[in-house]
């Protein structure tokens, strides 16, 4: 009578024992957990990265991120000639206006709702050597008071300009200057305009705008 081979002898001879249904099920389950974990992690990452960009678009009045062109930055700086005092960029995006203003000698602040853009702006300010005079904060523009700023820059959209016009007229001092890019304010009359097309910049004297509003 022949002796049956032990499991160890079968492995040494190159034979493979058949796997049980329970073992196959366990392997399949492990792969399922791994795939689910990878997909879940990817979805969380995508959500974390894209939410700051998508969330503003879901608000009643949105301020989308559209980078300023080099000519727009030049036009803004041109409108700031002979000006002094702190500057604020409402919806500062990637920080290029604030950084340019800081290089021109202004203590400049940018308010931006998107945290990724704020962190990138801070890095750019550090890299370009103006992090001491260029500051960036994560905030909703409607929750910030701008009374302390002598110079205000805004890259707005048409649907928000009437509401922002009222807010600035209520908060700013008479000596303040407001610079609008891409879209003008609906009721104010600019004292200076420069540029063409999307590079157009409108400059408003706050005192003149208030006088105009009283006459109307």
Curated annotation (Swiss-Prot):
Protein name per its UniProtKB record: ATP synthase subunit C lysine N-methyltransferase
Membrane topology: Single-pass membrane protein
Function: Mitochondrial protein-lysine N-methyltransferase that trimethylates ATP synthase subunit C, ATP5MC1 and ATP5MC2. Trimethylation is required for proper incorporation of the C subunit into the ATP synthase complex and mitochondrial respiration. Promotes chronic pain. Involved in persistent inflammatory and neuropathic pain: methyltransferase activity in the mitochondria of sensory neurons promotes chronic pain via a pathway that depends on the production of reactive oxygen species (ROS) and on the engagement of spinal cord microglia.
Any one GO MF annotation of this record: protein-lysine N-methyltransferase activity
Location of the region described as Required for mitochondrial location in the Swiss-Prot/TrEMBL record: 51-85
Modification sites for N-acetylmethionine: 1
CDD domains: AdoMet_MTases (cd02440)
Keyword Cytoplasm included in the entry's annotation: no
